């Protein structure tokens, strides 16, 4: 394989992994630990 193809595959895997981790953090089990600053603010 060409070096360019391997680099593109590597960067694509990194991007997909980061996106999956971000979705898991936002909506998965760790999301219960996140605080909502809008709910903490009282008018």
Curated annotation (Swiss-Prot):
Species whose genome carries this gene: Coleochaete orbicularis (Charophycean green alga)
InterPro entries registered for this protein in UniProt: PSII_PsbN
Protein name: Protein PsbN
Main location: plastid
Family: Belongs to the PsbN family.
Coiled-coil annotated spans: none
Keyword Plastid: yes
Membrane topology annotation: Single-pass membrane protein
Pfam families: PsbN
Localization of this protein: Plastid, Chloroplast thylakoid membrane
Gene Ontology BP terms: photosynthesis
Keyword tags: Chloroplast, Membrane, Plastid, Thylakoid, Transmembrane, Transmembrane helix
HAMAP family reported in the protein's UniProt record: PSII_PsbN
Described function: May play a role in photosystem I and II biogenesis.
Transmembrane spans: 4-24
């Amino acid at each position: 394989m060409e070096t360019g193809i391997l680099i593109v595959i590597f960067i694509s895997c990194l991007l997909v992994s980061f996106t999956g981790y971000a979705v898991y953090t936002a909506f998965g089990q760790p999301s219960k630990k996140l605080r909502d600053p809008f709910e903490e603010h009282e008018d």
